[in-house]
């Protein structure tokens, strides 16, 4: 039994083209079915807060994944790194970057909507400090994780609280 990671940042086809994922949603669906049939665990990587993405759209992605036989999920915020097309686009026309409080609230909602049996492998990420343009607050990963834990406890949020599958 081993793991395979499939990138699945969004359901919106415009985002898939923008980030150059290179394949449509149906390819992801087929790969999940084939991997599961082969006895391979599927861990999905979701990037939150793509340019123009709303929280409702992010939750639709979570709901979609809940309907798939995935075993694990990695959630993280979009990072803008120096030398990338995304950095160029951001410099030309800055788009919304959430502050830590907004991200934590969104992560709380994602966790509440996530199927209880899906293993959470990641709640945040930290881009290379020398390349990270935004969001700068992600560099304090331990602080972010502590704040997420405190928020979940204070708001009485647990995985699957809002899942009605």
What are these regions (language model features)?
Residues 28-29, 54, 58, 103, ...:
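Aromatic/hydrophobic pocket-lining residues that form the small-molecule binding cavity
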Residues 51-67:
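Catalytic cores of alpha/beta
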């Amino acid at each position: 039994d081993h793991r395979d990671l499939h990138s699945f940042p969004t359901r919106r086809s415009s985002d898939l083209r923008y980030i150059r994922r290179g394949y449509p949603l149906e390819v992801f669906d087929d790969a999940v079915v084939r991997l599961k049939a082969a006895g391979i665990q599927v861990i999905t990587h979701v990037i939150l807060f793509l340019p123009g993405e709303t929280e409702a759209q992010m939750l639709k992605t979570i709901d979609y994944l809940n309907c798939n036989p995935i075993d694990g999920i990695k959630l993280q915020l979009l990072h803008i790194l120096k030398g990338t097309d995304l950095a160029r686009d951001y410099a030309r026309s800055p788009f919304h970057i959430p502050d830590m409080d907004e991200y934590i609230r969104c992560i709380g909602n994602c966790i509440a909507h996530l199927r209880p049996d899906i293993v959470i492998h990641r709640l945040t990420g930290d881009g290379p400090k020398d390349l990270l343009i935004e969001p700068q607050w992600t560099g304090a990963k331990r602080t972010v994780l502590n704040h997420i834990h405190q928020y979940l406890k204070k708001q009485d949020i647990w995985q699957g609280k809002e899942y009605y599958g």
